């Protein structure tokens, strides 16, 4: 069940990026879909929700999905209802995931999430079906969820570590989803370099670009997961690995903001996954230096995700076609902030 929940979250996070591209929506609206998903993901961390309320969330989502399927409405109303569905489903699924003990290996769980990303373009063609399937999976997950009382928990921040994690997530979500959209649009406007893909391109350039963009993103995720797995085991000099890897990410992101060649841009994007995997060393160092608690780390991660996406939405409203390049620079700045934060934290620990 845990792996299935992981897979559906991947579809919910990226599926409506493909939907928005297929329907030529403004970039800021496209980015609001993953923002709604991550707002829901943040909700269970500091709130603990009772099972009855989670069933209400699922029921409201089901009703909204039925309305979206059968009731004609203005596009803006459809947009708001879809964002509501993504928010509620994300809150339910994340709460259930937190409450279910999973015996599967972490790599397996994460690859199921990547599989969800790979399947997410289906939402461009059958968005209501995806919502119905997600609601069914959420209801099934709730049957295995142990009820809890409502309470609000204030996260116990771990000083510089929490801030560094927040900046890392902020840098990543400043550019990731907007880059998926930008690459998808670029690939929909130029014939593929691989001739065998030419037929798929001519049938539907928008669909081809959307699928190709998502699959390249999946490539960055696979490289990230594998590199993180390797970096956490290869060396005891965790901070050296972090500084080198994140400095490389800083340089790569700045370079990407000036590159106009799509192929070179994609290659560098894949390299961000390799170098970005070094972030695992922060958690490793945190476990070595203080009593480790996953909750504040998770909260910092989710807060960074939301701040990064909010920045991307805000910039895309005012700068439109220039916003992907601007957000790459913002992502580089976030990486630099995370590096400086860890340098200061390490210096304080030496005193």
Which residue ranges define each predicted feature?
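Helix-loop boundary and gating motifs at the non-cytosolic
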Residues: 1-34, 172-202
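Hydrophobic core of transmembrane alpha-helices in multi-pass small-molecule transporters
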Residues: 7, 75-93, 264-279
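Transmembrane alpha-helices of Major Facilitator/SLC transporters
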Residues: 37-41, 212-234
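Structural signature of the two symmetry-related core transmembrane helices
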Residues: 52-66, 240-254
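Intracellular juxtamembrane helix-capping segments at the cytosolic ends
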Residues: 89-103, 277-291
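A membrane-interface helix-boundary motif in multi-pass transporters
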Residues: 122-134, 315-334
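C-terminal transmembrane helical hairpin of 12-TM major facilitator-type secondary transporters
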Residues: 242-279
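A late C-terminal transmembrane helix in Major Facilitator Superfamily
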Residues: 294-318
């Amino acid at each position: 069940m845990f792996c299935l929940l992981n897979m559906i979250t991947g579809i919910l996070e990226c599926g409506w990026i493909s939907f928005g591209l297929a329907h030529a929506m403004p970039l800021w609206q496209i980015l609001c879909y993953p923002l709604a998903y991550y707002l829901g993901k943040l909700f269970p961390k500091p709130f603990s929700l009772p099972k009855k309320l989670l069933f209400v969330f699922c029921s409201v989502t089901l009703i909204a999905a039925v309305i979206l399927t059968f009731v004609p409405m203005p596009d803006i109303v459809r947009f708001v209802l879809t964002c509501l569905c993504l928010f509620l489903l994300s809150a339910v699924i994340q709460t259930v995931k937190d409450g279910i003990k999973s015996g599967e290996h972490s790599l397996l769980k994460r690859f199921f999430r990547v599989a969800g990303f790979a399947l997410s373009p289906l939402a461009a063609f059958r968005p209501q079906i995806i919502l119905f399937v997600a609601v069914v999976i959420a209801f099934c997950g709730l049957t295995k969820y142990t009820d809890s009382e409502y309470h609000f928990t204030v996260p116990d921040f771990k000083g510089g570590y929490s801030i560094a994690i927040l900046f890392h997530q902020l840098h990543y979500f400043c550019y990731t989803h907007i880059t998926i959209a930008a690459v998808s649009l670029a690939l929909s406007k130029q014939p593929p370099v691989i001739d065998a893909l030419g037929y798929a391109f001519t049938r539907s350039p928008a669909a081809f670009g959307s699928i190709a963009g998502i699959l390249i993103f999946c490539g960055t995720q696979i490289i990230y997961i594998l590199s993180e797995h390797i970096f956490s085991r290869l060396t005891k000099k965790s901070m050296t690995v972090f500084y080198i890897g994140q400095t490389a990410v800083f340089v790569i992101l700045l370079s990407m903001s000036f590159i106009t060649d799509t192929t070179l841009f994609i290659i560098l994007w894949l390299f961000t996954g390799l170098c970005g995997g070094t972030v695992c060393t922060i958690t490793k160092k945190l476990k070595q230096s203080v009593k480790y608690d996953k909750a504040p780390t998770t909260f910092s991660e989710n807060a960074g995700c939301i701040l990064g996406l909010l920045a991307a939405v805000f910039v895309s409203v005012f700068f439109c076609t220039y916003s992907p390049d601007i957000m790459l620079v913002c992502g580089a700045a976030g990486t630099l902030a995370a590096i400086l934060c860890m340098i200061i934290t390490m210096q304080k620990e030496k005193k």
